Amino acid sequence: KRARPVIAWANALGHDTSRIMQVRLVKGAYWDSEIKHAQERGLTDFPLFTRKPATDVSYLACAKDMFEAAKIRPAFATHNALTVATILQWAGDNRDFEFQRLHGMGEGLFERLVREEGYQCRTYAPVGGHRDLLAYLVRRLLENGANSSFVHQLADQSISEDELLADPVEKIMAVGGTRHPAIAAPADLFQPERTNSLGVDLDDALILKETATEIAL
């Protein structure tokens, strides 16, 4: 949810320092842990969307912001064919950006774009022993094993092409909102027995400042 303000901040920083920075746009990798973190800490709300189509729309909105940011060189990390097609449509003749994919995934999607069309694609490959890679592999299993994952749906023969490539905006409108009713908000985690205790998100600079001010009083 905070991605668009971060993009605006990064672009402003580039203007202030007369530098162009590459910004990587990614989604989904830490979704489960972010949900659990917010519930355990009793935060006022989730820092991300609880419906997959809402995340897809947010990603595209951020992609558009990055194309319009003069001091940002976009790097789009995705295996979603609809997202890739949308980005290519918006880019037009602009080639000053790159795609990114995980090692072992997305070869078929990006092979033609790289070899025949000349687009850039960076491959993210894990390095290290099995102990170092275990957390990475678990995140990939959670991400790609989810029913809402594009990679998972692509392998599901029961899902039609039209359904796979449906407009995420239309999906949100069809379900009536961006919040998933089956995912309890942090305050409602223990309902109906009781309300969850309210935590303080010290990662939020504004909340940290307010907390420090109250302590000083």
Question: What do the predicted segments below correspond to?
Answer:
Residues 192-217:
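Non-catalytic terminal/interface segments that mediate subunit docking, oligomerization
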Residues 1-197:
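Positively charged, amphipathic and often flexible ligand-engagement surfaces
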